[in-house]
Amino acid sequence: MSLHADRITYTESVHHRWFPGTVDQVAQVRAYVRDKLSEFPAVDDAELLTSELATNAVQHTPSNLPGAGFGVLIEHEYGKSVRVTVHDGGSYFDAPYVAQPEPDSEHGRGLFLVDALATSWGSHATLSGRKTWFCIEN
């Protein structure tokens, strides 16, 4: 069963890891996702989207404070879907949103990519931060 009460499916593999909240850890997140989802057809998309959420955690939340960090949860239903959740120190009130950056801007496209490539995505506040997730279905 999934770890999420709002979604009843049979999850065949679940992986969780905590990462320090530093920029260099985004590369570690990418490698972690690639390792755990190596046989998932959309592994490239899952890796990219997870790195975008991890980057947001490090750049826009208290997850980057000394001693803080963020968690990555991967739920994989073989041959069907993957759901990745990034649990960071984000605000209870400030939800992430898809920005409309200027055409020549170097930043602000992370959630645009998530919105474009994921089957679904969302974010909700918890008592310990914010969980932002995406789903990719085959």
Identify the function of each model-found stretch.
Residues M1-H16, V58-N138:
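Conserved beta-strand-loop-beta-strand hairpin that lines the nucleotide-binding pocket
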Residues M1-L48:
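Bergerat-fold GHKL ATPase/HATPase_c domain
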Residues P41-P66:
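Conserved ATP-binding N-box helix of the HATPase_c
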